[in-house]
Amino acid sequence: WLVPERAGPGPSDGSSLVWLYHSHVHAPKDSNAGLIGAMIITAKGKTRPDGSPTDVDREFVTLFNIYNENQSWYFDINMKTYLRATNRVDTNDLFFIESNMKHTINGYLFANMPLMTMKQGERVRWYLLGMGSETDLHTAHWHGNTVLFHGHRTDVVELLPASMKVADMLADNPGT
């Protein structure tokens, strides 16, 4: 798979950037079923043999998204598998609809995502993705550490639907 140079970092970018892939075949059903992800493009000549950028020690990819299980390919299958009396469920009930809206980071709910650990002094690159609809307004927030984002130091990066952002961190505050 060849990536044209124009898809990679430009003169004002770091050594790598992120693109968001999602299906346009049966959207939003495909995206709500998980057919979504990141493509990281690193500038030619700035990669290690494994493809990672030479100017960072660790990379993290985070996708902030509200998955709408009501609009997933798996909705009917899950209803039949996990509910005994599907005919008693009002799928138009607002509480039922909201109960199937899954607020996630990388598809994980309720703080059950594996820890993203780093060592003090490591140069960490964060690839931040936001996807969804007008309700998907997210903020990536780091407690005790900051990132460099577009030349500015911050501890919060806003993510709107269909946004792709890269932030660099020097992990300097252990234990947070």
Annotate each language-model stretch with its function:
Residues 1-176:
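Copper-binding active sites and cupredoxin-like electron-transfer domains
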